Amino acid sequence: HNAMPSPILKELAQVITNAGNDDEVKVIVLKSGGDRTFCAGASFKELIAIDNLEAGDLFFSGFANVINAMRTCGKIIIGRVQGKAVGGGVGLASATDYCLATKYAAIKLSEISIGIGPFVIEPAVSKKIGVTAFSQMTIDAENFYSAEYAKEKGLYANVFETIEELDQAVNELANKLASYNPEALSELKNVLWQNTENWDTLLKERAKISGKLVLSSFTKEKLASYK
């Protein structure tokens, strides 16, 4: 279900940073494989294996680093969300600059239900959909919210019936952006992410909170029941 293990998170952060520094790259499209799930968030297998604070901190820093790479990258990032997004997947969608989805792209913030919380992704999600929607979804942790809800709250700019229509819209937008003045787009990116300069520190602090909670006996028992 497109869960995100640490090596993939590390690679993703690096690829985004490199693309941001590459003059040949005009626009970035963030997408995932398959047609069922966009991103299921943290890898349960890895969460279960975390047995010390350092490992927990390191794991959750993976998502922090990707969000910070997206935020500081000088290129506009289009999100292509073809299926469900859970936890960290919602965080990645929120960190794009313009996100398009299919009607199957429901979202869920399930972290509280397994004993942790969406702390690393909160700044990105709250910035995109507002604190009210974020807190509602976080507290109502076991329910999916529809793609229409996500559009209503501003996560998705548009929702399509099929993946084919989604891809057509993504390609059209990417081509359009590629024809615009790259300097203007770079300035736009700066403006869109103004006042997030403290996120380098903030998201690392949030990763520490999640890293600590994943070691709690409550969370350990909860995760063990999913084995």
Language-model-detected regions and their locations in the chain:
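C-terminal alpha-helix plus adjacent terminal tail
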Residues: 22, 35, 141-149, 163-227
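Crotonase-fold acyl-CoA enzyme core
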Residues: 69-180
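Glycine- (often His-adjacent) and acidic-residue-rich active-site loop
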Residues: 32-66, 85
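Terminal peptide-recognition signature
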Residues: 11-12, 30, 43, 76, ...
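Conserved CoA-thioester-binding segment of acyl-CoA-metabolizing enzymes
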Residues: 1-31, 68
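Acidic-histidine catalytic/liganding microenvironments
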Residues: 22, 50, 73-74
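Charged catalytic carboxylate motif
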Residues: 7-11, 62, 69, 169, ...
